[in-house]
Amino acid sequence: MAGALLSSCSGQKDGNNNNKKETTMKTINLTKEEFLTKVANFEASPNEWKYLGDKPAIVDFYASWCGPCKTIAPILEELAQEYGDSIVIYKVDTETEEELAGAFGIRSIPSLLFIPMNGQPQMAQGAMPKASFKEAIDKVLLNK
């Protein structure tokens, strides 16, 4: 995985955060039920990764109280707009979706799951600068 991994949080607090402007491309909050239908149904196929999406994706496992999560939130919003229809960026609030976070062994946030159309997803932990996100998107997700 490309890029320097900077900082992350571990622990607990509260919350939710994800409003943006207009109807331009933006990050999408997911519940466990939505994850099972849009990303991967790990309950039906616990031993095999089967991506259900129609474009590469990033899943940001975050919490609203986490400083590094707050740092990358606007970066992810910018990337969602910049890459438009090429990728989708999902967000999973680890405070409200504890079972989903547990299924992926999330112990440190932010944790980012990079999901290419083919092959296995890759997990990265900690905040990254925008340039590192772009490098990972281009190499891992878009094969540029």
Predicted regions and their residues:
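N-terminal targeting signals for export/organelle localization
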Residues: 1-36, 142-144
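Structural signal for short hydrophobic segments within the conserved structured cores
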Residues: 26-28, 88-90, 122-124
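A short beta-strand-turn-helix
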Residues: 30-56
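Conserved helix-turn-beta segment immediately C-terminal to the redox Cys motif
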Residues: 53-56, 71-92
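Short pre-active-site segment immediately N-terminal to redox-active cysteine/selenocysteine motifs
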Residues: 54-57, 61-65, 108
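Conserved redox-active cysteine motifs that mediate thiol-disulfide chemistry
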Residues: 61-75
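Glycine-rich active-site/cofactor-binding loop and its immediate structural neighborhood
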Residues: 89-106
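Non-catalytic, surface beta->alpha helical segment in thiol-disulfide oxidoreductase systems
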Residues: 108, 113-144
